[in-house]
Amino acid sequence: MIPQTPFYYYDTALLRATLDAIAQEIAPYPNFHVHYAMKANANPRLLEIIQQAGLGADCVSGGEVQKAIDAGFPADKIVYAGVGKSDWEILTALHHNIFCFNVESIPELEVINCLAAREGKIARVCLRINPDVEAHTHTHIITGMAENKFGIALKDMLQVVQLAQQLPNISFEGLHFHIGSQITNMQDFVAL
């Protein structure tokens, strides 16, 4: 009898070839790091292969942070970029000493600072800036326009950077941008 369960076949040879191509492309740039978006597919076997190829993990939930750790990603190659982070998710990431939180707002920055202080930690953060740049992709997955709800408005950036630099349990590392998905025209990024 055939089991009544889904079956997924992954071409791991193709995955490895793709990862090798990525490694070759970034080899001339030692300070350039590629992170795999865990939300694309969090199959543990695939994550192990991706981790073994040296990529980092881009996570959007505490569960994904934990899956990345479980798959062997070094904590210093994990970035947590999700919106609406709960206290337990922030604490999970702090406990593992991940590389960086991408922060969406002043209240989120203040919560991370407070939880880091409580845990005796310094949280590394980048600020997600909404640059008001149009990405030429499907309208439902554009995230970098002023009318989108994601990130810190460009006009507020300086104020939030100054706050991040003043908070005692925050280490301000830089800026983060995400203007949309499935972008095929690289000119969209030139506007950044």
Where are each of the predicted segments found?
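Short beta-strand segments
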Residues: 37, 124-130, 176-178
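Nucleic-acid-contacting surfaces of polymerase cores and analogous helical-repeat interfaces
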Residues: 68-73, 130-131, 138
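Active-site loop/helix belt of alpha/beta enzymes
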Residues: 131-192
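A charged N-terminal "starter" segment
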Residues: 1-123, 162, 166-172, 187, ...
